[in-house]
Amino acid sequence: MVKVEIDEGSGFCFGVVTAIHKAEEELAKGVTLYCLGDIVHNSREVERLKEMGLITINHEEFKQLHNAKVLLRAHGEPPETYIIAKENNIEIIDATCPVVLRLQKRIKQEYMQEDLDEKQIVIYGKNGHAEVLGLVGQTTGKAIVIEKLDEARRLDFSKSIRLYSQTTKSLDEFWEIVEYIKEHISPDVTFEYYDTICRQVANRMPNLRKFAASHDLIFFVSGKKSSNGKMLFEECKKVNPNSHLIDSADEIDDSLLPGVNSIGVCGATSTPKWLMEEISEAIKAQIKRQ
C-alpha cells in the first residue's frame, strides 16, 4: 500500500490567512471589493475568491478608481498607493502582513536619517516583487535591490552599507551575502545588516527538508508566480531529487507513481491546504487505477 502524506507545516502563512479572511469577511457583506494585485500567488485560490466576487486590479486601474473599497494584500504597498487612495476617496482594507509593515518602517527610518549620501540601503530580494516594490518605495526608489550573491559584487564598497531582506528569501543566501560584504567593504566605512526574513518562513526550511527526505516522491504544490514557492521547492530538490513542482492535480505525472512506497505532498506559504488535499486525493485515485 502506497502512503500519501501531506506536510502539516505547509500552507498559508498567517499574513496570507489574514488577507484572505478580510476579503471573505467583506465579500460576505455583499459589497464590491477590489484587490490590488493577486491576493496570493496561487491561481486556484485567486479563482476561488473571484467566484465569491473579488475583483483583482493592477496599479493603473487603481489610479482610475474612485469612491471604492480596495484590499491591500499581505505583500504591502509603497507610500504612493496610500496617497492615491486618499485623493480618489478609496477606502483601504489594509491586510499588509505585520512582519512586512515593521520592515517598511525600519527602512523608512533608515532612509530619513541625515547621512543618506554616505550610505547605500540594500535590499536582498526579487526585483519587481510586490513586497520589494513596497520596501523600495519607502526610500523613494533609492534602495538598491540585489537578487543573489553575484549581484552583491556591484555594490560600492567605499560607501557604508545597510542590508535588509525581503521577508520570504533564503536565510542561507542572506548570510552568504553578509560574509561577502564583510570581506570586501572598506575599513573606513560601516556595514550593518538586519536579518528581516520572516521566522515562520525560515523555520519551515528544516521541517520541509526532513519531510522531503522521508518520502520516495515529492509533489510540491505552488503557483508559478510564488517567490517563496520557488525557494522552498529548491530546498526540497536538494534533499530529494525526485521532487516535482505542480500547481494543480492536472499536472500529476502518472509515470512517476509506479514503484514508489511513499509520496509526500507539500507547498509554499501561498498554497492553500484545500489544494494540497485535492492533489493528495487525486494521487490516491490514480494509484488505484494503476
UniProtKB/Swiss-Prot annotation:
Residues involved in [4Fe-4S] cluster binding: C13, C97, C198
Active site: E131
Chain residues that bind dimethylallyl diphosphate: H41, H75, H129, S226, S227, N228, S270
Binding site for (2E)-4-hydroxy-3-methylbut-2-enyl diphosphate: H41, H75, H129, T167, S226, S227, N228, S270
Manner of cofactor binding, per the entry note: Binds 1 [4Fe-4S] cluster per subunit.
Keywords: 4Fe-4S, Iron, Iron-sulfur, Isoprene biosynthesis, Metal-binding, Oxidoreductase
Catalyzed reactions per annotation: isopentenyl diphosphate + 2 oxidized [2Fe-2S]-[ferredoxin] + H2O = (2E)-4-hydroxy-3-methylbut-2-enyl diphosphate + 2 reduced [2Fe-2S]-[ferredoxin] + 2 H(+); dimethylallyl diphosphate + 2 oxidized [2Fe-2S]-[ferredoxin] + H2O = (2E)-4-hydroxy-3-methylbut-2-enyl diphosphate + 2 reduced [2Fe-2S]-[ferredoxin] + 2 H(+)
Binding site for isopentenyl diphosphate: H41, H75, H129, S226, S227, N228, S270
Pathway in which the depicted protein is active: Isoprenoid biosynthesis; dimethylallyl diphosphate biosynthesis; dimethylallyl diphosphate from (2E)-4-hydroxy-3-methylbutenyl diphosphate: step 1/1; Isoprenoid biosynthesis; isopentenyl diphosphate biosynthesis via DXP pathway; isopentenyl diphosphate from 1-deoxy-D-xylulose 5-phosphate: step 6/6
Domain of life: Bacteria
One GO term of the biological process aspect: dimethylallyl diphosphate biosynthetic process
Entry cofactors: [4Fe-4S] cluster
GO molecular function: 4 iron, 4 sulfur cluster binding; 4-hydroxy-3-methylbut-2-enyl diphosphate reductase activity; metal ion binding
E.C. number: 1.17.7.4
UniProt family annotation: Belongs to the IspH family.
Function, as annotated: Catalyzes the conversion of 1-hydroxy-2-methyl-2-(E)-butenyl 4-diphosphate (HMBPP) into a mixture of isopentenyl diphosphate (IPP) and dimethylallyl diphosphate (DMAPP). Acts in the terminal step of the DOXP/MEP pathway for isoprenoid precursor biosynthesis.
Protein name according to UniProt: 4-hydroxy-3-methylbut-2-enyl diphosphate reductase
The species this protein was found in: Bacteroides fragilis (strain ATCC 25285 / DSM 2151 / CCUG 4856 / JCM 11019 / LMG 10263 / NCTC 9343 / Onslow / VPI 2553 / EN-2)
